[in-house]
């Protein structure tokens, strides 16, 4: 898509060369063929070192652009970014893609729908009522139970188990907000990657990323009714007990243990080998690995136990 076409859709002028762009990405990860954006002055240094050649920016950041950049000056970059994501959004069904392929020894129930462009490996089992969207990859020896929904572009590794009712790749919950209180959808143009030997319990929901990938890494086990929001990165061999929720763009290191009904805020970084007791409320990043935590606000588990003793004695 030409930058001039994007500018026309946004009803804003563009400056510089009229570049051909194939997608969007966040500033730190953007490539020369991608449109990116900088919402405020906080991103001035990232802007100067960006590999992208096309930008949505506020006027005060023009001086920070790399040489020979093309750009659109936006009164509200957040709104313009949301509007631009719609232009790069892929259709859920693409008839022009080649027919799906199914590996040797796989058993696909007659009540399963598999869209074009999808590749299913060997010895895969897909049970009745499942839906697999366009351009997905399902690894060898994976089992998909009834009524699982897998949206387009999802990649699932080998020897995974996906239990009934799971939804993988639905849109992340992302909106930009106008001054008038309207909510402008940020189209989620990334995907979900499930690495090898992952088990996902019944009725879990794992949202697709805005631009790149939501990742569940090798060997991780999810209990039932768990929500993983867009852009999350869940470290390998982690365990999540039922009814846990992880906010967008939060990253957990390997071998974390998260007990039931715990919740994580967005944009956190959690150190490897961290353990959280039931109903933990995690609102800040954790840098030290191997810690055990409880409560809300979150605290060291031993401290939390001492606090519970003191609370129990308040009426004495």
From Swiss-Prot:
InterPro entries: Hexapep (IPR001451), LpxD (IPR007691), Trimer_LpxA-like_sf (IPR011004), UDP_GlcNAc_AcTrfase_non-rep (IPR020573). Its EC number is 2.3.1.191. The keyword Repeat applies. Catalyzes the N-acylation of UDP-3-O-acylglucosamine using 3-hydroxyacyl-ACP as the acyl donor. Is involved in the biosynthesis of lipid A, a phosphorylated glycolipid that anchors the lipopolysaccharide to the outer membrane of the cell. NCBIfam families: lipid_A_lpxD (TIGR01853), PRK00892.1 (NF002060). Keywords: Acyltransferase, Lipid A biosynthesis, Lipid biosynthesis, Lipid metabolism, Repeat, Transferase. The gene is lpxD2. Belongs to the transferase hexapeptide repeat family. LpxD subfamily. Pathway: Bacterial outer membrane biogenesis; LPS lipid A biosynthesis. It catalyses: a UDP-3-O-[(3R)-3-hydroxyacyl]-alpha-D-glucosamine + a (3R)-hydroxyacyl-[ACP] = a UDP-2-N,3-O-bis[(3R)-3-hydroxyacyl]-alpha-D-glucosamine + holo-[ACP] + H(+). It holds the Pfam family LpxD. This is UDP-3-O-acylglucosamine N-acyltransferase 2. Homotrimer. It comes from Sulfurimonas denitrificans (strain ATCC 33889 / DSM 1251) (Thiomicrospira denitrificans (strain ATCC 33889 / DSM 1251)). It is an enzyme of class 2 (transferase). One of its GO terms (cellular component) is membrane. One of its GO terms (biological process) is lipid A biosynthetic process. PANTHER family: UDP-3-O-ACYLGLUCOSAMINE N-ACYLTRANSFERASE, UDP-3-O-ACYLGLUCOSAMINE N-ACYLTRANSFERASE 1, MITOCHONDRIAL-RELATED. The keyword Lipid biosynthesis applies. The active site is at 230 (proton acceptor). GO terms for molecular function: N-acyltransferase activity.
